[in-house]
Design a protein with these regions (language model features):
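OB-fold ssDNA-binding interfaces and closely related basic DNA-contact patches used
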Residues: 2-178, 240-283
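Extended serine/threonine-enriched, polar tracts that run as long, contiguous segments within proteins
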Residues: 148-237
């Protein structure tokens, strides 16, 4: 049983990983509810788990937007909605369509454009936010690993890919060096909440962890793999976008539109686009099925 299970897990071919990266760059519900969180200023040793059998990648992208929502107390809070194109397989996403239409209507209004797509520190703009999910855990001497969701930013993804895509003279690495059940290398990851740019510090530092100046592996035990096998594949961790997500996005957009005096929801042409976006989810029973026991 154990040997059969081990044989199903494999590291990802670099050629496949590069294709996924190119696809991610083009666009530039967790089963165990546990997340791996980095600690400010601490170098954490991290072991990434492999893709489940049948999965193409050990990580998946997440794309979302921050919007404004009114809670039960009447207070306005910021929250996220997923992107329907990536997470629902649709042709249109409501927030993306809103941004395109707003640019068409207010493109020459610098103040409006700053509110819509500005990148200031306290900006509430509608720029998409990207992150990636994989299964991983912190390596601690003598302790068993338990796969957790590690959500990381593009800078970390790029640093991981830089390590994976490195070449040894004339012989390129053909599989990723992180996820093999026996030979997966341990990472050293440091998060700096307030990096000292003058000293060359970055928000994230990612390298192979080393012993005697050499990268080292941390094999996964049969018990660790059996426990991991019971978790959802990473591609199923982010729920599929449906009608309820659309309704949440519509609510958040209307609040944002009112806060920023864009008044697009008084525009019949924009409301026609809203109806076209909504039609993508009508007749889809996915949301209803999720309610069934």
């Amino acid at each position: 049983m154990a040997n059969s299970l081990r044989s199903q897990y494999r590291a990802i071919k670099i050629s496949s990983l590069k294709k996924a990266v190119d696809k991610d760059d083009a666009m530039v519900g967790v089963s165990n509810n546990e997340y791996l969180n980095l600690e400010d200023g601490k170098v954490m040793k991290i072991r990434i788990f492999p893709a489940h059998p049948g999965e193409e990648q050990f990580y998946v992208p997440r794309k979302c937007y921050w919007l404004s929502f009114v809670n039960s107390d009447g207070d306005v809070k910021r929250g996220t909605v997923l992107d329907s194109i990536l997470h629902g397989g649709t042709k249109m996403d409501l927030v993306n369509e809103y941004v395109k239409y707003a640019k068409k209507k207010y493109g020459k209004d610098a103040e409006k454009m700053e509110a819509l797509t500005g990148t200031g520190l306290n900006s509430n703009a509608l720029n998409p936010q990207y992150s990636w999910f994989c299964y991983a855990d912190e390596v601690k001497e003598g302790e068993e690993l338990h796969a957790k969701i590690w959500e990381f930013k593009k800078m970390v993804r790029d640093l991981l890919n830089k390590l994976a895509f490195s070449e040894d003279d004339d012989e390129p690495i053909e599989v990723d060096p992180f996820t093999d059940v026996d030979d997966g290398l341990v990472l050293a990851v440091k998060y700096n909440k307030k990096p000292n740019k003058k000293k060359g510090e970055q928000y994230y530092e990612v390298d192979f962890a080393k012993k005697s100046k050499q990268p080292y592996s941390r094999p996964l035990s049969d018990d660790e793999l059996e426990s991991f096998a019971n978790l959802k594949p990473i591609s199923e961790v982010i729920p599929k976008y449906g009608m309820r997500d659309y309704e949440r996005a519509l609510d958040g957009l209307q609040n944002w539109d009112e806060e920023n005096d864009f008044n697009l929801f008084d525009d019949d042409e924009w409301l026609d686009i809203v109806e076209k976006v909504k039609a993508q989810y009508e007749g889809n029973d996915d949301d209803d099925e999720e309610e069934k026991p």
